[in-house]
Amino acid sequence: MIATRDDVCRQAGLQYGWLPHAFQAPRTLRGWLSDRGSLTQRLRSRYRDFRVLPVLRGVAAPFPDESGALGLARDASAYVRDVLLLGDGKARVFAHSVLPRAALRGGWNGIARLGTRPLGEALFRTPRVRRLAMTMRRVDARHPLYCAARRHAEVAERALWARRSVFCLDGHPLLVSEVFLPALLTP
């Protein structure tokens, strides 16, 4: 059976150790992990100075678990955007977005031009965008998402909690992973 784009949108994210709940997460992080609202809005309301710092953008190979979740071939490339979400000058969240290249020609075509604007604003302002699967897990040095977060932010912890959401627009999935950095829980 050949999967359609809508099938990929429905199934993405529910694999590779990603779970639909955060029961094992520290109590202080559970609300952040499970909140289905805009992370951008939540960070803006918590910090006086909220900014987006782009650290990587362009065509790249998705992480292995992302290719599977998006229904891409293992050797396929995608558009990748990595940013740090800063609150009062400190990196609070590392965000990693992956979009199949074919989707850049459709409704997602503005993603490549976001620059320092938050992706969350575009996602939650567009009525046709649907948030589907939202999963979470603890990532450590064995997971490339942890390594990417550590490369761009000062992280001493051996593991971090992350959540991953699939947003769908016109049948095209966009995978957004957010790694919650230790500074999120500090003033």
Swiss-Prot record:
| Gene Ontology terms describing biological process | pyruvate biosynthetic process; ubiquinone biosynthetic process
**What Pfam families does this protein's entry cite?**
Chor_lyase
SUPFAM superfamilies recorded:
Chorismate lyase-like
Q: Which GO terms describe its cellular component?
A: cytosol
The molecular function GO annotations come to: chorismate lyase activity
Tell me which InterPro entries the record gives: Chorismate--pyruvate_lyase, Chorismate_lyase_/UTRA_dom_sf
> Where found?
Cytoplasm
The catalysed reaction is: chorismate = 4-hydroxybenzoate + pyruvate
Task: Say if the entry is tagged with keyword Disulfide bond.
Answer: no
Pathway in which the depicted protein is active:
Cofactor biosynthesis; ubiquinone biosynthesis
- Which Enzyme Commission number(s) are on file for it? 4.1.3.40
Indicate which residues the UniProt annotation says bind substrate. R81, L119, E178
Tell me which UniProt keywords the record has, alphabetically. Answer: Cytoplasm, Lyase, Pyruvate, Ubiquinone biosynthesis
Family named by the database record: Belongs to the UbiC family.
What this protein is reported to do is described as: Removes the pyruvyl group from chorismate, with concomitant aromatization of the ring, to provide 4-hydroxybenzoate (4HB) for the ubiquinone pathway.
Record's protein name: Probable chorismate pyruvate-lyase
Q: Which gene encodes it?
A: ubiC
